Amino acid sequence: MNSLLMITACLVLFGTVWSEKGYLVHEDTGCRYKCTFSGENSYCDKECKSQGGDSGICQSKACYCQGLPEDTKTWPLIGKLCGRK
């Protein structure tokens, strides 16, 4: 019984360690996906899920995602400063 509990705990931990989180970013401009209302946000949730994430919220006027695939690019992008030179 104890070993089953340990295996289950390890699998849960493995899922949280290997998933990414961060602000969604437009790769062509380096700008974050904008949103208006902080907290739960259907637009951000939809955009995050379309990128393979588990969920999304609006935080600091930008879409913040949880559970993104490892290869998903998040803000900031090196060399892309969102309109700044």
UniProtKB/Swiss-Prot annotation:
Gene3D superfamilies from the UniProt entry: Knottin, scorpion toxin-like
A GO molecular function held by the record: toxin activity
Expressing tissues: Expressed by the venom gland.
Sequence positions bearing Cysteine amide: C82
Disulfide bonds: C31-C82, C35-C58, C44-C63, C48-C65
Domain LCN-type CS-alpha/beta per the UniProt entry, residue ranges: 20-83
One Pfam assignment: Toxin_3
Compartments where found: Secreted
Alphabetically ordered keywords of this record: Amidation, Disulfide bond, Ion channel impairing toxin, Neurotoxin, Secreted, Signal, Toxin, Voltage-gated sodium channel impairing toxin
Major location category of this protein: secreted
Keyword Disulfide bond among UniProt keywords: yes
Cellular component annotations (GO), alphabetically ordered: extracellular region
Keyword Disulfide bond annotated: yes
GO biological process: defense response
Cleavable signal peptide: 1-19
Entries under InterPro entries matching the protein: LCN-type_CS_alpha_beta_dom, Scorpion_toxin-like, Scorpion_toxin-like_sf, Scorpion_toxinL, Scorpion_toxinL/defensin
Record-stated family: Belongs to the long (4 C-C) scorpion toxin superfamily. Sodium channel inhibitor family. Beta subfamily.
The protein's role, per its UniProt record: Beta toxins bind voltage-independently at site-4 of sodium channels (Nav) and shift the voltage of activation toward more negative potentials thereby affecting sodium channel activation and promoting spontaneous and repetitive firing.
Domain notes: Has the structural arrangement of an alpha-helix connected to antiparallel beta-sheets by disulfide bonds (CS-alpha/beta).
Protein name in the entry: Toxin CsE8
Source organism per UniProt: Centruroides sculpturatus (Arizona bark scorpion)
